[in-house]
Amino acid sequence: MYKECFKIALGIEYNGSNYHGWQYQKFASSVQEKVELALSIIANHPVRVTCAGRTDAGVHSTGQVVHFCTSSIRNDQAWILGTNRYLPKDISVIWKRDVPMHFHARYSALSRRYRYILYNNSCRSSIFYQGLKFYHRILNVEKMNQAAQYLLGEHDFTTFRSSHCQSKTPFRKILYVNVFCINCLIIIDIVANSFLYHMVRNIVGCLIEIGISKKKVTWIRDILKFKNRTSSTKIVESNGLYLVQVQYSSLFKLPICPVGPFFV
């Protein structure tokens, strides 16, 4: 007997510290694996999800979006609370929406927003060590923000691209970038149509060099033009990086959630 198939979108929050990234791994634990296992129990059939952005090992999210198809009819409480019951404590479904069949978590996205959070203090934090990048030297936030503005617009971001990046084009368009501080936290807030592999973490590494006055503010503009990864600096750790928002057309009527993480 034929059963009608529905498409559902979910908002997913997770602490990526214990996972080898979002994407399913044959010999390592992934966020995708845990989400699919939990949803399959609720749906009573195997579920495969597609995400908006495949985060790396150790990267967190407060705004991941996924979609999946199902013929099972469940209420919102079952899809959210029921799924969470079978998820580990460091992964949560935070919202659910029915979406049209042409919706695609990745290809329907208009932009992605990441935040990298530095804990700029003389002593590290034992409470938030998994979710913050500790940096003990004093950083000049104003210089970092000035430098970041050179990245606005569409550019060839080869300089900030991993050598393992599989994207067919190095061109990306940064729509917004801001570096600001809240007490001991320095937040690098960046929005783009999409990102290259390791792009945000490589950018942050360069901004730190400028923040400690090792490099001039205009250095980031110059190395962007070089289009050479070796002209940049070393990549920063993944533990300070968060996928915080994915933007879609208002026609899909997805919820507008506060930009995380909650302690910012």
UniProtKB/Swiss-Prot annotation:
A single GO molecular function term of this UniProt record: tRNA pseudouridine(38-40) synthase activity
Disulfide bonds: none
Active site, renumbered: D56
Gene Ontology biological-process annotations: tRNA pseudouridine synthesis
EC annotation from Swiss-Prot or TrEMBL: 5.4.99.12
Keyword terms: Isomerase, tRNA processing
Positions that bind substrate: Y114
Catalyses which reaction(s): uridine(38/39/40) in tRNA = pseudouridine(38/39/40) in tRNA
Superkingdom as given in the UniProt entry: Bacteria
Keyword Nucleus attached: no
Protein's job: Formation of pseudouridine at positions 38, 39 and 40 in the anticodon stem and loop of transfer RNAs.
NCBIfam families documented for this protein: hisT_truA
Assembly with partners or alone: Homodimer.
Family: Belongs to the tRNA pseudouridine synthase TruA family.
Protein name per its UniProtKB record: tRNA pseudouridine synthase A
Organismal lineage: Bacteria, Pseudomonadati, Pseudomonadota, Gammaproteobacteria, Enterobacterales
UniProt gene name: truA
